[in-house]
Amino acid sequence: MKFRTLGEYYEKLEATSKRLELIDILSKLFKESNAEEIGKICYLLQGRVAPFFEPTEIGMAEAMIAQAVARAFETDKNSVLKLYREKGNFGLAAQSLADRLQTTDHSRKKAVDSSPLTVSEVCSKLLEIANFSGEGTVEKKVGTLSELLKKLDPVSVKHVVNIPLGTLRLGIGGPTVLDSLSLAKHGDKTLRPILEDAYNKTSDLGFVAQTFFKSGIGAVKKTKLIVGKPVRPALAERLPSAEEA
């Protein structure tokens, strides 16, 4: 899947807060996905590049993001920060700059349109940024993100910038994703309990989704506790009275 397509789905998801609509949109997204990328898509929908329990953080604060955006779209850091204050969101500021530059620089727009990056390629670059360490880390992160942004359409730029900042607000939780996976592959939500059981054993939506898409619901049913993947804690049940506690 091209990341541009995922960006378009992000836009649709942002436009609604109704759970049934979110499930419908997500199920259509998942129908367009294959087994190799479905796990990555589930992480990206949560604003992540790995499960929540893994200490994989992109590690870029606003100042570094501003540097990367400025370098990608041929402006200066202060101009980026000013636009951010006007828009109230770094992603929107970056989208505006990308749109402005691609409108005036037709060769850049042609390059972006002719070779759109895939979801896997974008996820790989974000993981690369997250794994940088040691001397020169800041420059490596800024440079790599800048080069990535240059290759994306404006809508994709918006969402990629919001991911490291934790400002990707899609309103999608685990239950919504599980319902959508069942609907996409089975036509209804009846497989949700089986998917949820596997999720509870692994705390890893991407793993569950990939197993489901690659090997089917039978393989999901066989999911066991996995070393390194924590079990999700069960919610406490309310008792009728304090005496029964």
Describe the residue ranges of each PLM region.
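N-terminal nucleic-acid-engaging modules of covalent nucleotidyltransferase systems
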Residues: M1-A245
